[in-house]
Amino acid sequence: MSEPRNVRYVTIRAVLFDFSGTLFRLEHDSLAAHAGLMRALTAPVGLADGLDIDPAQWERRDLDPDAHRDMHLAVLAKAGAKDPAKFYADLCSPPFWQPYPDTAQALGTELPTAVVSNIAWDISAVFARHGVENRVDEFVLSYQEGFVKPDPKIFRIACDRLGVHPTEALMIGDSAEADGGAAAVGCQVEIVEPLPTGSRPEALLQVLRKHI
């Protein structure tokens, strides 16, 4: 059977990963009672229902560490958190972030790899805690770059630093709205579900097998 016409096959030469809900998930016994609030606070874009706060300010939280802290403390206080400051510190603490079972293997493809995240703190410590920081070539973080996903600029930055054209990169994330922005610059995009780590054993590897 002949190949379909006008189909372009591109070799993937680099992989871009989202952080929260893709490679790692905020999970800790002390946070179990606040699962709904955790989902709202770690959503990559948008303002979750029930968070009484200025949407414009919330959208900019991942561009400035001080604003990130202030906004989260305000939300936590309104949600009735007993100690908002400690709660916020836990959200930014490596021990509270757990890797998915296939994270280490997914980061070991030998292709150039970047983590592209809407975040306002240095997540490299999370990777270091689990011994995989050396498997990431570039951390492209919104608060350092001045752009948040789905802005195409942040994906271009990641591809430029890895030395590949966007059409040669695969973006893997958990949000079609945020991570799907990579398609605007030509990246291939795959979305995984941000399930609890114990419920998603090899979604990353399944995606990688489709493309690499």
What are these regions (language model features)?
Residues 1-15, 25, 82, 104-108, ...:
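Asp-based, Mg2+/Mn2+-dependent phosphohydrolase catalytic module
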